[in-house]
Curated annotation (Swiss-Prot):
PANTHER family xref list: ALPHA AMYLASE DOMAIN-CONTAINING PROTEIN (PTHR45825:SF11), GRANULE-BOUND STARCH SYNTHASE 1, CHLOROPLASTIC/AMYLOPLASTIC (PTHR45825)
Family: Belongs to the glycosyltransferase 1 family. Bacterial/plant glycogen synthase subfamily.
E.C. number: 2.4.1.21
A GO BP annotation: glycogen biosynthetic process
CDD domains, per database record: GT5_Glycogen_synthase_DULL1-like (cd03791)
SUPFAM superfamilies: UDP-Glycosyltransferase/glycogen phosphorylase
Top-rank taxon: Bacteria
Entry keyword Transmembrane helix: no
Keyword annotations of the record: Glycogen biosynthesis, Glycosyltransferase, Transferase
Main EC class the enzyme belongs to: transferase
Protein's organism: Klebsiella pneumoniae (strain 342)
Pfam families with a match to the protein in the record: Glyco_transf_5, Glycos_transf_1
Protein name: Glycogen synthase
Length: 477
């Protein structure tokens, strides 16, 4: 079986979010399962530099201009690159300029990605043709539409990593992207009077997956579906919507092998984690105190991630003797709020604005609790890293967070199921109650250690996900 992933980023070549982590790990896991898997990406500068052995496959004139299709390898995975400097050779973000404005030609840049994905199933590379084309998020959303226009030369899977980003463009761009105007209607890619790349993926794909079973259920409800609930409910009834949980790349996230940690450890040497905490406290300007539970945030600072709730609950966390270490960037109001808290509570609150992959490992290895209070969370990887590192996740019961973290309730503790702390309602009071439960468990060190070991024992490997995708592909064939 031959599978092509169509997407816009891949860790470690280029990363703006969790999508990159998935594409950095899933194809390799599928190859290990015996599936001939390759990836198609735009040749953004960082990606182009990283694929050093790229050779020309073919050149084509397209609706978006002249392109060269390249093929090379990265970390043992075959990579196709769409080399179109006039579209992709731009510094910084792949999606917007330095003023955070979306590029005005994004409609062409990402329509081309979908078009090439479809053409691969029609022999664009004469030596390799996919049986399944697996597109990810709105950037690749037109892929199933182009396949449908082509008479479906391959089966298509569309994975929703985040339904909030819908890839909306003016309707007149139908003239620019070489799809029939008949596709522009409510039973197609039209949404609220515009073209939606996301809806194209949802409507035309043979099967839709969400990145967790709970999120797959949630997106059939209005509060999570951003207007797509009717279509998603229909796909659910047709048996064409399912949830497959993301995994963790053990090669990158593993406390016993993590070279970015001052001190490596495993579930049998958890006492070594204390040195990581000490060094993290020093690095973040916090008081060195092994008795104070260290809560951490590694996140985009947005209301979706519930970081306003953390700011609201922070006085209660500090009053009980806790510390906070935060790494992230985003909403300027939230950034200012956390910086002000750090200034007001020196030694108790440490804040680094920005994102540094290496430092996120040090936080995960040194903190006691990782906070993930999201209003919605399709899968979430942060809590999975927390589980791996014995850094107990404190999460809201939504999406993938609900599927992966079990609350330290008395029943779960008695049954050996507890792996963290879970709260229900998206408000600061509910969050504070969970923080209070974390302090109660912290006051019982042997019980805390027991829950850490339970957490570290969980298996969220990519092999599990790769096997689930293989079963799905086989059902479609």
């Amino acid at each position: 079986m031959q599978v092509l992933h169509v997407c816009s980023e891949m860790f470690p070549l280029l990363k703006t979010g969790g999508l990159a982590d998935v594409i950095g790990a899933l194809p390799a896991a599928q190859i290990a399962e015996g599936i001939d898997t390759r990836v198609l990406l735009p040749a953004f500068p960082d990606i182009r530099r990283g694929v050093v052995d790229a050779q020309v496959v073919t050149r084509r004139d397209t609706f978006a201009g002249r392109i060269t299709l390249l093929y090379g390898h990265f970390n043992g995975v075959g990579i196709y690159l769409i080399d179109a400097p006039h579209l992709y050779d731009r510094p910084g973000s792949p999606y917007h300029d330095t003023n955070q404005h979306a590029y005005t030609d994004n409609v062409l840049r990402f329509a081309l990605l979908g078009w090439v994905g479809s053409e691969m199933a029609s022999g664009l590379d004469p030596f390799w043709r996919p049986d399944v084309v697996h597109a990810h998020d709105w950037h690749a959303g037109l892929t199933p539409a182009y396949l449908a226009a082509r008479g479906r030369p391959a089966k298509s899977v569309f994975t929703v990593h985040n339904l909030a980003y819908q890839g909306m463009f003016y309707s007149w761009h139908m003239n620019d992207i070489e799809l029939p105007w008949s596709f522009y209607n409510m039973h197609g890619l039209e949404f609220n009077g515009q073209i939606s790349f996301l809806k194209a993926g949802l409507y035309y794909a043979d099967h839709i997956t969400a990145v967790s079973p709970t999120y797959a259920r949630e997106i059939t409800e209005p509060q999570y579906a951003y207007g797509m609930e009717g279509l998603l409910r229909q796909r659910h009834h047709e048996g064409r919507l399912s949830g497959i949980l993301n995994g963790v790349d053990d090669g990158i996230w593993s406390p016993q092998n993590d070279l970015l940690l001052p001190m490596r450890y495993d579930r049998d040497t958890l006492e070594e984690k204390a040195e990581n905490k000490r060094q993290l406290q020093i690095a973040m300007g916090l008081k060195v105190d092994d008795k104070a539970p260290l809560f951490a945030v590694v996140s985009r600072l947005t209301s979706q991630k519930g970081l306003d709730l953390v700011l609201e609950a922070l006085p209660g966390l500090l009053e009980q003797g806790g510390q906070l270490a935060l790494l992230g960037a985003g909403d300027p109001v939230l950034q200012e709020g956390f910086l002000a808290a750090a200034a007001e509570h020196p030694g108790k609150v440490g804040v680094q604005i920005g994102y540094h992959e290496a430092f996120s490992h040090r936080i995960m290895g040194g903190a006691d609790v990782i906070l993930v209070p999201s209003r919605f969370e399709p899968c979430g990887l942060t809590q999975l890293y927390g589980l791996k590192y014995g850094t107990l996740p404190l999460v809201r019961r939504t999406g993938g967070l609900a599927d992966t973290v079990s609350d330290s309730s008395l029943e779960n503790l008695a049954d050996g199921l507890a792996t963290g702390f879970v709260f229900e309602d998206s408000n600061a009071l509910s969050l504070l109650r969970a923080i209070r439960r974390a302090f109660v468990l912290w006051s019982r060190p042997s019980l805390w250690r027991y829950v850490q070991r339970q957490a570290m024992n969980m298996d969220f490997s990519w092999q599990v996900a790769a096997n689930s995708y293989r079963e799905l592909y086989q059902r479609l064939m």
